[in-house]
Regions:
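Zymogen propeptides
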Residues: 23-126, 204
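Bacterial Sec-dependent N-terminal signal peptides
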Residues: 1-25
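Generic structural signal for short, solvent-exposed loop/turn connectors between secondary structure elements
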Residues: 16, 21-23, 92, 107, ...
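Active-site beta-strand/loop microenvironment that shapes enzyme catalytic pockets
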Residues: 91, 117-278
Length: 280
């Protein structure tokens, strides 16, 4: 009798755990709004409430076969930083996001490697950044957009495969496995880029501050299988701007632990390097 009770308790505990895991892994439901060919948008509730704002995740889904991607950088265009709407309006882009974090000592330079065709914004790989956004393929047999995992793919083997690169910190590796960040208690507004096993590209923005590890868990709860994700920017610099015939959407961050602990930012900041998207 005692054995049966122990067995029953163990069974129920295991069933509860499996049910909880299943719910966590598919807890985000997304309904896409088509903005233009190959570009979709959705605002969804994050699985966890934030300390500030609406706890929403703003997600752009992109079919890379139907759009063109561009790196636009101040170092290539008049040495002048611009807001996301200014970048979009000047260069005719439907979507603009940060291309990565910039170097605080060289404010026009990406912190990691960045190249756009013959223009090198930063020619040096950042040692601890294991992710690389790549697009504008040199060979038509290559995918139009990739997130390369430099911990699994040697840089020398892929550095001439594409014409446009931007290096950043990995959040999920090429096998879909989460990475743990050491800054466990740092909260910030956040922008990141992800790709799924079908090749769709996702830009994910949150005005509400979360830790990096919380955001990684949110990515794993998406209803698509992510095979790579990179952190792009946080705080008031984090920018997402969408301007299509059907809709205009403006998203900018605010909160960063210790350096900007408020939700008061009410405008886009000027940023030096962006990724632009326009329909072919």
């Amino acid at each position: 009798m005692q054995f049966n009770k122990i067995y029953l308790f163990t069974f129920l505990l295991l069933a509860s755990f499996c049910r909880s895991f299943s719910q966590d892994s598919t807890c985000i439901t997304i309904t896409w709004d088509s903005l233009s060919p190959g570009i979709f948008f959705s605002d969804v509730d994050a699985p966890k409430k934030s300390i500030l704002n609406d706890s929403k995740l703003s997600i752009v889904k992109i079919d890379p076969t139907k759009v063109e991607f561009s790196i636009l950088s101040a170092s290539e265009h008049e040495n002048k930083s611009r807001t996301a709407p200014e970048w979009a309006n000047e260069f005719g882009m439907s979507v603009i996001i940060n291309a990565g974090m910039y170097d605080l000592n060289k404010t026009l330079s990406n912190k990691g490697f960045m190249q756009n065709f013959n223009h090198l914004n930063n020619p040096t790989l950042y040692p601890s950044y294991g992710g690389m956004i790549a697009f504008n393929p040199a060979d038509t047999t290559l995918n139009n957009f990739e997130i390369l995992d430099l911990e699994h793919t040697p840089w020398d083997s892929v550095k001439t495969c594409y014409y446009s690169y931007s290096q950043g910190m990995r959040m999920i590796d090429c096998n879909g496995s989460p990475l743990t960040w050491n800054k466990k208690n740092q909260l910030c507004s956040m922008l990141l880029c992800a790709i799924d096993k079908e090749g769709f590209v996702y830009y994910i923005f949150s005005r509400s501050p979360y830790t990096h590890n919380e955001m990684i868990r949110f990515l794993l709860a998406m209803p698509f299988e992510i095979t790579g994700a990179i952190y792009l920017e946080g705080g008031p610099e984090a920018s997402m701007y969408i301007n299509t015939p059907n809709k205009k959407i403006e998203k900018y961050g605010s909160y960063v632990s210790r350096s900007y602990e408020n939700d008061k930012n009410d405008h886009f900041w000027k940023i030096p390097n962006v990724i632009g998207v326009k329909t072919k």
